[in-house]
Amino acid sequence: MRALWIVAVLLVGVEGSLFELGKMIWQETGKNPVKNYGLYGCNCGVGGRGEPLDATDRCCFVHKCCYKKLTDCDSKKDRYSYKWKNKAIVCGKNQPCMQEMCECDKAFAICLRENLDTYNKSFRYHLKPSCKKTSEQC
């Protein structure tokens, strides 16, 4: 549990209910979320933007788009509840916006798991200024 708290602290600046998001990624992928996704590609982590480099990076792009659609909540501060039940994420009974945030994070963690085979270690600490602008909109 202490390691997950450290993960949450290291993710400061990344949108969302950080502690829960970090746990979801760890549970779904078995990977350390900060080390493996904190600066991955063009769209993961703080300041991410640009044309996705691969399917893993596209997960981050879609996640940011999902957050842009949230209503009446602060994706940087509000916290939601969820459970890890039978190796599946189950969002708890939350207020509407926090429920939406939980669903965004759940879809993101599942997307990362489903695209583990595209994960490219050379994109792990990718320099954002080298990312090409994308015409793709949310």
UniProtKB/Swiss-Prot annotation:
Described purpose of this protein according to its UniProt entry: Snake venom phospholipase A2 homolog that lacks enzymatic activity. Is myotoxic. Has a strong indirect hemolytic activity and anticoagulant activity. A model of myotoxic mechanism has been proposed: an apo Lys49-PLA2 is activated by the entrance of a hydrophobic molecule (e.g. fatty acid) at the hydrophobic channel of the protein leading to a reorientation of a monomer.
Record text on subunit structure and interactions: Monomer.
Recorded GO MF terms: calcium ion binding; calcium-dependent phospholipase A2 activity; phospholipid binding; toxin activity
Entry annotated with the keyword Cytoplasm: no
InterPro entries for this protein: PLipase_A2, PLipase_A2_Asp_AS, PLipase_A2_dom, PLipase_A2_dom_sf, PLipase_A2_His_AS
Cysteine-cysteine disulfides: 42-131, 44-60, 59-111, 65-138, 66-104, 73-97, 91-102
SMART domains: PA2c
Signal peptide: 1-16
Site (Cationic membrane-docking site (MDoS)) residue list: 128, 133
Site label Important residue of the cationic membrane-docking site (MDoS), positions: 121, 124
GO biological process, any: phospholipid metabolic process
The keyword Signal is annotated on this UniProt entry: yes
Segments crossing the lipid bilayer: none
Organism: Deinagkistrodon acutus (Hundred-pace snake)
Stretch list, region Important for membrane-damaging activities in eukaryotes and bacteria: 121-133
Name of the protein this chain belongs to: Basic phospholipase A2 homolog acutohaemolysin
Places the protein is found: Secreted
The entry's keywords: Disulfide bond, Myotoxin, Secreted, Signal, Toxin
PANTHER family in UniProt: PHOSPHOLIPASE A2 FAMILY MEMBER, PHOSPHOLIPASE A2, MEMBRANE ASSOCIATED
Tissue expression pattern: Expressed by the venom gland.
